[in-house]
Amino acid sequence: SWLDILVLHAAGFCRFVSKADIKDWPVIGMMATHAGTLYIARDSRRDALRVVHHMRDALQRGEVVAVFPEGTTSDGLTLLPFHANLIQAAISAESPVLPVALEFIDSRSGQMSTAPMYIGDQTLIESVWRTLTTPGLRAVVSYGEPQSPEGRERREWAAELRESVAALRTTTGAG
């Protein structure tokens, strides 16, 4: 959701890779741009290659770069397959990857909340309003152990990282 970037940035500074549309969103786009977000045209293979090069350069400079390897938004109840393309940047930069799980929890029930979801026909305003008016909404960020890129192939590593993130999820387990 749109809230993922804000929560993860609050938990620790990082640059994000995000779909190009976000830079045109009111307020959130401006904040994402000022945070150094790398924008990607998701339907362009050439643009993915460009972003991988920028990510590699940022990682080699010691910057922290965050990606959403599912490549799309969902209701958050299940974990979608991870795309491997952007993981190549960590392999090329010889940079470890830190698996991170982000969940929105209804603190009253302890269950996963779908309040912040922004999918389908919903508008951004509807999602923001629902998030702001949901009582007891709590963001939980869980960190795994850093994983070295040494000897990794990006597709296999993407599947392993997905398993690591699934294990970090507190409300849904393997997702």
Model-derived segments and spans:
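C-terminal alpha-helix
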Residues: 163-171
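Conserved ATPase "switch" residues in P-loop NTPase domains
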Residues: 59
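A cross-family acyltransferase "interaction/gating" segment
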Residues: 27-30, 44, 77-156, 160
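Short active-site segment of divalent metal-dependent hydrolases/proteases
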Residues: 73-74
